[in-house]
Amino acid sequence: MSGLVRLGVILTDRGSKYAVSGAAVASRAEIDSVLNDLKSDKTYAKATHNTWAATLPTGALKADDGESGAGMVILRMIERAELQNHVIIVTRWYGGKKLGGDRFRRVQDATRAYLDHIGVQS
């Protein structure tokens, strides 16, 4: 078990649904374990994008999973909040309409919801 916290679907925009999850991690192997745990749920495995970012003692990591630039949005928010040894995953199920730049605002909204949930100032 990875200690994964799932907030589920927290917002929708023009048919797209966004969820946010996260966990404390100390290594890339633990990030992979958290991602595998999340994707063991078929709903998340079938998502259009599972973008994520993490801070580790060895440095920061991120992945866009096809949602270009989204990992960096999450990473900037994690770094601004000074959250260490943590991964945050923003999941999107595409709703059929392109969101343009609003997709980054939705990623920010989801990340902020997670940070608020764990009691970290964003």
Positions of the model-derived regions?
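C-terminal regulatory domains involved in ligand/effector binding and gene-expression control
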Residues: M1-S68, I78, D116-V120
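Functionally constrained cores in energy, signaling, and assembly domains
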Residues: G22, H86, K98
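Short glycine/proline-enriched loop/turn "hinge" motifs that connect secondary-structure elements
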Residues: M77-L83
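Active-site-proximal loop/helix of nucleotide/amide-processing enzymes and allied scaffolds
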Residues: G69-G71, V90-S122
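Glycine- and acidic-rich phosphate- and metal-coordinating loops
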Residues: A54, N85-Y94
